[in-house]
Amino acid sequence: MAFSELLDLVGGLGRFQVLQTMALMVSIMWLCTQSMLENFSAAVPSHRCWAPLLDNSTAQASILGSLSPEALLAISIPPGPNQRPHQCRRFRQPQWQLLDPNATATSWSEADTEPCVDGWVYDRSIFTSTIVAKWNLVCDSHALKPMAQSIYLAGILVGAAACGPASDRFGRRLVLTWSYLQMAVMGTAAAFAPAFPVYCLFRFLLAFAVAGVMMNTGTLLMEWTAARARPLVMTLNSLGFSFGHGLTAAVAYGVRDWTLLQLVVSVPFFLCFLYSWWLAESARWLLTTGRLDWGLQELWRVAAINGKGAVQDTLTPEVLLSAMREELSMGQPPASLGTLLRMPGLRFRTCISTLCWFAFGFTFFGLALDLQALGSNIFLLQMFIGVVDIPAKMGALLLLSHLGRRPTLAASLLLAGLCILANTLVPHEMGALRSALAVLGLGGVGAAFTCITIYSSELFPTVLRMTAVGLGQMAARGGAILGPLVRLLGVHGPWLPLLVYGTVPVLSGLAALLLPETQSLPLPDTIQDVQNQAVKKATHGTLGNSVLKSTQF
């Protein structure tokens, strides 16, 4: 018997799978808080230069008479581009002439100002502390904030490259357990980082482990669940991220100090580390690596949890050995990336699906990690992202079944891109409309993620499927790294980053229309199967055109 029959024997969808899905889904929710954390821990508070007349009590006492704080601000800090107090410059000397009601903007010149040589004063009414205020990541150092986010996302990229081979060699559960511990330790260490480069290093190592959690969570769910239930289980796993957005907003609303917030979202992974020892190692991996005794013990344990303890009498080492031989005989030799890119039809599919993966990572992380640019209440925005993400993903699943893969993916990307582009035309003062369009756009990106995850698996043959999907996921992570850096274009115009974020999914959505439809088609196992599907489609199209021509009056 094949492994799928062994899984049905011990229970492919029972109490064990329910408990396993719940346990892993909890860790995914807390993992999402780490990825979205810097919306709050790295929020940029309102700030201005430190000025003696405003912030030095001795200087204030030397002023004859009494001046209001507004008057002291006017003679100490020049107006900025938005006519509010400048965030990065101050007057070299108090401009007393500005107290004259007849004073104008020409009463002072740029030469009368200087950078914030004595530091900044931050508004602490919303957040008592952020990494931006701690290390002064503003003005000339403002690029360091998106750089820190890109370093975190680069850690996920590097971790994915390392954790995949590690889990194939040492096992899924062992790498997952280590990743939980590494996330807990590195997250806790980041809270006490003495300097910004050290903080970035700890966040990079934390993100390295994030990749291990994401990859091995999905693998364990897939390898312990019957084929008929895998779409449901993987959708629930994906919804863990949706619930994680709401959890992030709730925790950040209650904890306004970045150090404590970093601790609160890191400590739960110590608990995940402890209960991960209960999780079963993948029996499929154990069998294919020759660990028959361990694999038998895990299968017996799962059978007992699922109420099928009697199978121990029939599930013997000989049966396992037979299953392993059959499973290996059914396998096919792996094909290389060169094969994927060498054949024109596969190369075309690879380029477009990779572009769609890139658009997801680039747009989602570019927008979702800078909520301050999308609206005034970032707590509600973070909550709404999770609320909208749930129906977006569920709706995408329904449309994939009824409308088809190609139109659903294209529509999701086009919706996301058009909502983002529309935001470039909305005045900054219309915060509610800007927030609504941004959340709707992110919902479209979430739907596109569901589509491309399923669609890309159906576009490629079995011998190349993991290579193609892995390439797409690498493109998504590469896009995620670039996404935050595009915000630096905002110095040339606040609309420019949104223009880039909106254009990429629109172009990807249009390109997706060129892909073949795979709805109701069997999964191709070989490259020849893909070619046969293309020939059938071309033949069907030719016959269809002939029928239409023959029935015209």
Swiss-Prot record:
Q: How is it modified after translation?
A: N-glycosylated.
Q: Which residues are noted as glycosylation sites?
A: 56, 102
Key words of the record = Cell membrane, Disease variant, Glycoprotein, Ion transport, Membrane, Phosphoprotein, Transmembrane, Transmembrane helix, Transport
Entry's InterPro entries?
Answer: MFS, MFS_dom, MFS_trans_sf
Q: Which residues form the signal peptide?
A: none
Q: Write down the PROSITE patterns for this protein, in alphabetical order.
A: MFS (PS50850)
Provide a GO CC annotation, any one: plasma membrane
SUPFAM superfamilies on file: MFS general substrate transporter (SSF103473)
The transmembrane segments are: 9-29, 146-166, 174-194, 195-215, 232-252, 260-280, 351-371, 378-398, 407-427, 435-455, 466-486, 495-515
Reactions catalysed according to its record: urate(out) + (S)-lactate(in) = urate(in) + (S)-lactate(out); nicotinate(in) + urate(out) = nicotinate(out) + urate(in); urate(out) + n chloride(in) = urate(in) + n chloride(out); orotate(out) + nicotinate(in) = orotate(in) + nicotinate(out)
Primary location group: membrane
Kindly state a single biological-process term from the GO annotations of this entry. cellular homeostasis
Q: Which GO terms describe its molecular function?
A: PDZ domain binding; urate transmembrane transporter activity
Tell me the outcome of changing residue 290 to C: In some gout patients; uncertain significance
Result, substituting residue 382 to L: In RHUC1; strongly reduced urate transport
Sites bearing Phosphothreonine, chain numbering: 542
Look up and give the membrane topology term: Multi-pass membrane protein
Q: Where in the cell is it found?
A: Apical cell membrane
Write out the tissue specificity statement of the associated record. Detected in kidney (at protein level). Detected in fetal and adult kidney. Detected in epithelial cells of proximal tubules in renal cortex.
Q: Any keyword Glycoprotein? A: yes
Tell me, in a sentence or two, what this protein's role is: Electroneutral antiporter that translocates urate across the apical membrane of proximal tubular cells in exchange for monovalent organic or inorganic anions. Involved in renal reabsorption of urate and helps maintaining blood levels of uric acid. Mediates urate uptake by an exchange with organic anions such as (S)-lactate and nicotinate, and inorganic anion Cl(-). Other inorganic anions such as Br(-), I(-) and NO3(-) may also act as counteranions that exchange for urate.
Do you know which PANTHER family this protein is assigned to?
A: SOLUTE CARRIER FAMILY 22 MEMBER (PTHR24064)
Which disorder is it associated with?
Hypouricemia renal 1: A disorder characterized by impaired uric acid reabsorption at the apical membrane of proximal renal tubule cells, and high urinary urate excretion. Patients often appear asymptomatic, but may be subject to exercise-induced acute renal failure, chronic renal dysfunction and nephrolithiasis.
This protein's name: Solute carrier family 22 member 12
Q: Which gene encodes it?
A: SLC22A12
